[in-house]
Amino acid sequence: MAEIRNYTMNFGPQHPAAHGVLRLVLELDGEVIQRADPHIGLLHRATEKLAEHKTFLQALPYMDRLDYVSMMVNEHAYVMAIEKLLGIEVPERAQYIRVMFDEITRVLNHLLWLGAHALDVGAMTVFLYAFREREDLMDCYEAVSGARMHAAYYRPGGVYRDLPDRMPQYQAQHTRNESTMKSMNANRQGSLLDFIEDFTTRFPAYVDEYETLLTDNRIWKQRTVGIGVVAPERALALGFTGPMLRGSGVEWDLRKKQPYEVYERMDFDIPVGTNGDCYDRYLVRIEEMRQSNRIIRQCVDWLRKNPGPIMVDNHKVSPPPRVDMKQNMEELIHHFKLFTEGMHVPAGEAYAAVEHPKGEFGIYLVSDGANKPYRMKIRAPGFAHLEALDEMSRGHMIADVVAIIGTQDIVFGEIDR
C-alpha cells in the first residue's frame, strides 16, 4: 500500500496576503496545516550595519524605512537613545509634538492594518474607508516635514520645525470644479492644529462606521473568532508585545508602565482582550484608535496654550537659526561642523523603547565617543510575532493563515531590517 505523506506548499512571497515578501513553507494534511515555516530575509537591507558608517544624524532617515507604515515612532526610539547618551532634556513643547505625532502614526498604522486585514479576509469596503482617513493624516505629516511618509521630523534634542500656521490646500484641476475645491479645502483654512482638532472631532464617527461593517458581521466573526488563539502565559513566553500581548489579556503598555516624554500626563485607557484570538486583537486595535484620538486631542489643547522652543539650545546638537547663521560667523561654523562632521556622542550604551503600533520597538546604541554609532541593534516587535506563526496556525485551514498573518500586522521592513 502506498505511503500517505503530507503535502508541502509555498505560500508567497508573491501573494497578496503575504504583506510584502513573506515566504511560508506549509506542510499540509489535506487542507489542515501541520507545520508553517516562515522564510525571512528577502527585504534585508543591512540597516544596522549602514548606520555604523553614517553620522548619528545621517542614520535618522533609515529609521523611517524600517516599519514603513509607522515612520515617526521608529524615529522616536532612535532619537531617545541618542538623547540618553547625550544626557539632554527635550523642550516640553517638542515632547508634546512628539506624543501627538506618535498617536497620529498609531492611527495611520491601525487604519492600514484594518483595511488590509479586512481585504485579505474578503471585506473590501473597509479598505476604501480606511484610506479616506489616512489621507488626512498623511497631510499632517506633509505639513510638518514636506513628506507624506518618510518624514525625518524628529531630531536629537527636539523636532525639525514648529507646527505650521497654515495647511497645504488642494489646487484646482480640470477634473474638479470650484464648488468641489471649496468643500475639499473647507477644513484647511486654519493652522495644522485646527485641522487636527477638526479630524479628532470627526474620527470617532468613522471608527463607528468600521465597526458597523465588521464587529457584528457574521462572516467576519466566523473568520476570526477562535482563530490563532494564544494564552497569556504563552504570549509572554513568545516575547509578544503591543496589541498581540494585550489581545491575550496581559495589560502591558510602555506608555503606562514605563512612561516616556509626557505620556504620564495623558488621560487614556489600555484596551485588553480576553480570549487571545484574532477577533480580540481586532477589538483591541479598534479601541486603541479611539484612545489615540483622545491623546491627540489633549496634545492639541496643550500646544495651543503653550508656545515655546522645539529644540534644545545647544549648537553642538541642534543647528542655529538661519537668521543668526547669516549674520554671525560663529553660528555658521557651528552649522557647518554639525552637518559635515556630525555630533560627537559620549562613549557609553543606551537602550530606548517606545510603544510602537505593533509592540515594543527598541533601539540599543553603543557609542565609542565618535560621531558615528559603534553598534546599533534594532528590536523589531514583528520579529517575535512572526516566530509564533507556526504555533498559531497549526491545526487550522489554509484560509485561516491569511487571517493569522493579518492579525499579526506584519511589515517586513522592520523584520528583515
Swiss-Prot record:
EC number(s) from the headed UniProt entry: 7.1.1.-
GO molecular function, one term: NAD binding
Cell location: Cell inner membrane
Keywords (A to Z) from UniProt: Cell inner membrane, Cell membrane, Membrane, NAD, Quinone, Translocase, Transport, Ubiquinone
Membrane topology (UniProt): Peripheral membrane protein
One Gene Ontology cellular component annotation held by this UniProt entry: plasma membrane
A Pfam family the protein falls into: Complex1_49kDa
Major place of residence: membrane
Lineage: superkingdom: Bacteria
Catalytic activity reported: a quinone + NADH + 5 H(+)(in) = a quinol + NAD(+) + 4 H(+)(out)
Family annotation (InterPro entries): NADH_Q_OxRdtase_suD, NADH_UbQ_OxRdtase_49kDa_CS, NDH1_su_D/H, NiFe-Hase_large
PROSITE patterns: COMPLEX1_49K
UniProt-listed NCBIfam families: NuoD, PRK06075.1
Subunit field text: NDH-1 is composed of 14 different subunits. Subunits NuoB, C, D, E, F, and G constitute the peripheral sector of the complex.
Function of the molecule: NDH-1 shuttles electrons from NADH, via FMN and iron-sulfur (Fe-S) centers, to quinones in the respiratory chain. The immediate electron acceptor for the enzyme in this species is believed to be ubiquinone. Couples the redox reaction to proton translocation (for every two electrons transferred, four hydrogen ions are translocated across the cytoplasmic membrane), and thus conserves the redox energy in a proton gradient.
UniProt similarity note: Belongs to the complex I 49 kDa subunit family.
Record's protein name: NADH-quinone oxidoreductase subunit D
Natural source organism: Thiobacillus denitrificans (strain ATCC 25259 / T1)
Organism lineage string: Bacteria, Pseudomonadati, Pseudomonadota, Betaproteobacteria, Nitrosomonadales
